[in-house]
């Protein structure tokens, strides 16, 4: 089966490096599916999930804060601010961040950074969705 190299990296570290048969991410205009021999492309990614199907058929779920996806003939590179593998998510901590962001947005005053609260809420929601997808996959 044909594969393409996939690299997911942040400013701090390499998050994933390996061969993939399919990479799915959410771009600004919708969901993208990148397979081997895909045409070159560069696009911004929305906060959401990235699903990498490895050469052995395993699906790896990542929750990302947004970023840039670049496709070249032999490699897909995803540059992100933050990315977390679904299996590494601390559900209690993420729920706490989500609840705090919701509270700030509901009771906003002059001192609330609305954009930051919205970013935290979006990131927490994405992480919880990735965790839920991982749990569903483990049940099957």
From Swiss-Prot:
The keyword Membrane applies. Keywords: ATP synthesis, Cell inner membrane, Cell membrane, CF(1), Hydrogen ion transport, Ion transport, Membrane, Transport. One of its GO terms (cellular component) is plasma membrane. It is found in: Cell inner membrane. SUPFAM superfamilies: Epsilon subunit of F1F0-ATP synthase C-terminal domain, Epsilon subunit of F1F0-ATP synthase N-terminal domain. It is a peripheral membrane protein. The keyword Cell cycle does not apply. GO terms for molecular function: ATP binding; proton-transporting ATP synthase activity, rotational mechanism. Pfam families: ATP-synt_DE (PF00401), ATP-synt_DE_N (PF02823). F-type ATPases have 2 components, CF(1) - the catalytic core - and CF(0) - the membrane proton channel. CF(1) has five subunits: alpha(3), beta(3), gamma(1), delta(1), epsilon(1). CF(0) has three main subunits: a, b and c. Belongs to the ATPase epsilon chain family. Produces ATP from ADP in the presence of a proton gradient across the membrane. This is ATP synthase epsilon chain. The lineage of its organism: Bacteria, Pseudomonadati, Pseudomonadota, Gammaproteobacteria, Lysobacterales. The gene is atpC.
């Amino acid at each position: 089966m044909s594969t393409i190299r996939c690299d997911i990296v942040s400013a701090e570290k390499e998050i994933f490096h390996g061969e993939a048969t399919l990479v799915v991410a959410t771009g600004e205009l919708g969901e993208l599916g990148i397979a081997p021999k895909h045409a070159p492309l560069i696009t911004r990614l929305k906060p959401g999930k990235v699903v990498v199907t490895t050469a052995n058929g395993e699906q790896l779920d990542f929750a990302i804060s947004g970023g840039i996806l670049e496709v070249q003939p032999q490699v897909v590179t995803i540059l992100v601010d933050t990315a977390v593998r679904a299996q590494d998510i601390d559900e209690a901590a993420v729920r706490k961040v989500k609840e705090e962001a919701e509270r700030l947005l509901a009771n906003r005053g002059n001192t609330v950074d609305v954009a930051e609260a919205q970013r935290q809420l979006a990131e927490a929601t994405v992480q919880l969705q990735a965790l839920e997808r991982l749990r569903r996959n483990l049940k099957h």
